[in-house]
C-alpha cells in the first residue's frame, strides 16, 4: 500500500465532488490509501524477475487488506490524540476520475479515503449492525428473513440520519444496500 496526503485545496474539492461529501475540503488532513502493486512490480523488474502476480486477485486482495489495515492504524493513532476521523469509501464513486486526478499509474488502485482533524462537535455514534447479523459460529449462516431481522436496525439508522445536522438524509440501511446493489 501507499498513502497519498491530499494538501491541494482544489484537489480536495474535486474529491469532495466525487465522494458527494461537502465537508472534505474543510478536513484538517485528507489521505487516500491505495493498493500499490506498481512499487512491487518495479522492485521485481529491477531484480530481473518477471512480475506476473500483480494482476492476480489474491495479490490484489492482500494489498487491499494491507491498505485498509494501515488506514485503521491511522484512525487508532489519530483518535488516541483526541482527533476525529471519517472513512471515505465514497471516494470510489468514480474510481476512474479519482485515479486520473491522483495520477495513479497501472497497478495502483484507490482503496479508501480518510479525513482526519479536530472535531467541532462530538458526533453521535453511527448505529452498528446487530451482532447476530455479522458474527457467526463455525459456518456462514444466511439471514432467514433479512428485512424482518433488520427492521429495528433500519429504524435506528433512519433516526440517526434524521437527527444529523449535516449531510441529513432520510434513509434506511436496507434501502442503502438495495441502491448500491442495483
Question: Over which residues does each language-model region extend?
Answer:
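Acidic, surface-exposed loops and disordered segments
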Residues: 1-182
Amino acid at each position: 500500500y501507499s498513502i497519498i496526503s491530499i494538501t491541494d485545496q482544489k484537489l480536495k474539492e474535486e474529491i469532495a465532488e466525487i465522494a458527494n461529501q461537502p465537508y472534505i475540503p474543510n478536513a484538517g488532513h485528507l489521505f487516500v490509501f491505495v493498493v500499490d502493486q506498481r512499487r512491487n512490480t518495479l522492485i521485481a523488474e529491477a531484480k530481473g524477475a518477471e512480475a506476473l502476480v500483480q494482476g492476480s486477485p489474491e495479490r490484489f486482495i492482500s494489498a487491499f487488506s494491507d491498505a485498509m489495515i494501515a488506514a485503521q492504524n491511522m484512525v487508532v493513532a489519530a483518535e488516541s490524540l483526541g482527533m476525529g476521523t471519517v472513512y471515505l469509501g465514497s471516494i470510489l464513486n468514480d474510481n476512474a476520475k479519482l485515479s486520473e486526478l491522483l495520477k495513479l499509474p497501472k497497478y495502483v488502485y484507490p482503496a479508501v479515503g480518510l479525513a482526519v482533524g479536530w472535531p467541532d462537535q462530538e458526533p453521535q455514534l453511527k448505529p452498528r449492525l446487530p451482532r447476530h447479523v455479522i458474527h457467526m459460529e463455525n459456518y456462514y449462516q444466511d439471514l432467514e428473513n433479512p428485512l424482518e431481522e433488520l427492521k429495528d436496525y433500519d429504524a435506528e439508522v433512519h433516526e440517526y440520519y434524521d437527527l444529523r445536522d449535516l449531510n441529513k438524509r432520510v434513509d434506511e440501511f436496507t434501502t442503502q444496500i438495495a441502491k448500491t446493489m442495483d
